[in-house]
Amino acid sequence: MASGTAVNAAPSGGPGDVSLEEPKKMTREDWRKKKELEEQRKLGNAPAEVDEEGKDINPHIPQYISSVPWYIDPSKRPTLKHQRPQPEKQKQYSSSGDWYKRGVKEHSIATRYRKGACENCGALTHKKKDCMERPRKVGAKYTGMNIAPDEHVQPQLMFDYDGKRDRWNGYNPEEHMKIVEEYAKVDLAKRTLKAQKLQEELASGKLEQVERDHNSEDEDEDKYADDIDMPGQNFDSKRRITVRNLRIREDIAKYLRNLDPNSAYYDPKTRAMRENPYANTGKNPDEVGYAGDNFVRYTGDTISMAQTQLFAWEAYDKGSEVHLQADPTKLELLYKSFKVKKEDFKAQQKESILEKYGGQEHLDAPPAELLLAQTEDYVEYSRHGTVIKGQEKAIACSKNEEDVKINNHTCIWGSYWKEGKWGYKCCHSFVKFSYCTGEAGKEIANAEANLLEEQPREEEHMTKPKTLMEIHQEKQKEKKKKKHKKSSNSDSEGEEKKKQEKLKKALNAEEARLLQVKEIMQLDERKRPYNSVYETREPTEEEMEAYRMKRQRPDDPMASFLGQ
């Protein structure tokens, strides 16, 4: 016992030995010295503690962090190793250069069985219990034939935070050579096109002018590059379209257009400036290059949607159950039908007024400028008729080209007019790109006209074309006639008798159906026969009327007297 006690009480001799002494309670003096030493270290008057690696320990670290647990280091040496990541708990991540192998060729098939391979197929990459091939009657281990090739097993990659987000990981730089070759082909095509165009200009004698216009070779290359689309790219050099976050150098930022802090507000998150930055400067919004983003609020279907919403509110006030968000399709169809009916009503109202009071000729009159040959434009003329002040009246130009004679014609197109057709005066031809036939063409045209005049006119087959007003009036009359016929037919006695007979048959069928339903409902649920209520045809009006007449209404206070 004495020797054992002496061993336990003896201090460790070597520096690497771990002391197994029980912790002793500190005296008041030792505790006070320890606290004073800590204060001196915090003030910088005493050197800081040093760990086993020679690193200083910050004296301001709290004790519950700097104190070492007994199960980590029983020697109680000052250290912060327990606060650092433990090596045995660190995950082993794959390096940045590791990636899945692509395009790996299968190895050559073995001719004899190898030790440790699958007994069923002979592959080295798996065992018999993991084999996915059909179980053979005699395995490859015993036959040594039809040995399957070894599968290529991809590595199990485990990347850290940066490795998972590395977009270039696994990229083969040799793939970029394909793009380089493609650009080289485009460059060769440019040079070929340039050489071909120079040859054409040299042959036509325009080479000097080209050399004077394009002095540098770079400008010439840009000229040809604008005409050729790059592969996979559709770019128009005349309309430079930029992305939202990319601006050209000449563009002015929205927040720099007006430096007054009380001007239009610029939202940096959405990069939007709703109001006009030049509102308080007195500039016309039509003259400035940028007048705010509020114009976007009135583009697209915004106005039509606002009109639909207004129609929904008005229809709801008048008793129609429509809502823009709840029933958008119903509201859209209702609004379209409303607009059509409104236009028809206006047209009918206009027609009725014109029929009653007349005045259609005033609506077909030409504009006042053409009718009175005067405008509000001020023009001052001299004594000789020349314009002194104002803009001279433009001479009306013909829509046809003047003084252009084609296909041997001696007159221009439009020099001849007959029966609403334009033609050539030289040959009376009404085909624009026809060849001139001269006097012979005139004689043929006159002979055809005389032949048509000699033929008897069949006036009964010739009908004068009707105007839109007459066609609309005829349609309205036909609608009224149809309505009158329907009302007269429905009031006839024969139709009424037929309807009564059909209704009687429908009532009998409905009573039979109700009796059948009553019998089925009296049976047990498990003994009821299968009865399908599916009907392919639509019920007639008489069947619906019979169903309504025979239907029981529990809410009706007189329903209890029906069976009496």
From Swiss-Prot:
Composition bias (Basic residues) maps to: 478-487
Q: Which family does it belong to?
A: Belongs to the SLU7 family.
Family annotation (Pfam families): Slu7 (PF11708)
Assembly notes = Component of pre-catalytic, catalytic and post-catalytic spliceosomes. Associates with the spliceosome prior to recognition of the 3'-splice site for step II, probably during catalysis of step I.
**Where, subcellularly, is it found?**
Nucleus; Nucleus speckle; Cytoplasm
Q: What is this protein called?
A: Pre-mRNA-splicing factor SLU7
Q: Name one GO cellular component term.
A: spliceosomal complex
Q: Which GO biological process annotations does it have?
A: mRNA splicing, via spliceosome; RNA splicing
Quote the function comment for this protein: Required for pre-mRNA splicing as component of the spliceosome. Participates in the second catalytic step of pre-mRNA splicing, when the free hydroxyl group of exon I attacks the 3'-splice site to generate spliced mRNA and the excised lariat intron. Required for holding exon 1 properly in the spliceosome and for correct AG identification when more than one possible AG exists in 3'-splicing site region. May be involved in the activation of proximal AG. Probably also involved in alternative splicing regulation.
- Which PANTHER family does the entry link to? PRE-MRNA-SPLICING FACTOR SLU7, STEP II SPLICING FACTOR SLU7
Q: Where is the composition biased (Acidic residues)?
A: 216-229
Q: Which GO terms describe its molecular function?
A: pre-mRNA 3'-splice site binding; zinc ion binding
Basic and acidic residues compositional bias, start-end: 21-42, 495-507, 535-556
Zinc fingers, CCHC-type, are found at 116-133
Disordered: region residues:
1-61, 75-100, 204-231, 473-507, 519-564
Q: Which domain of life is it from?
A: Eukaryota
Keywords on record = Cytoplasm, Metal-binding, mRNA processing, mRNA splicing, Nucleus, Spliceosome, Zinc, Zinc-finger
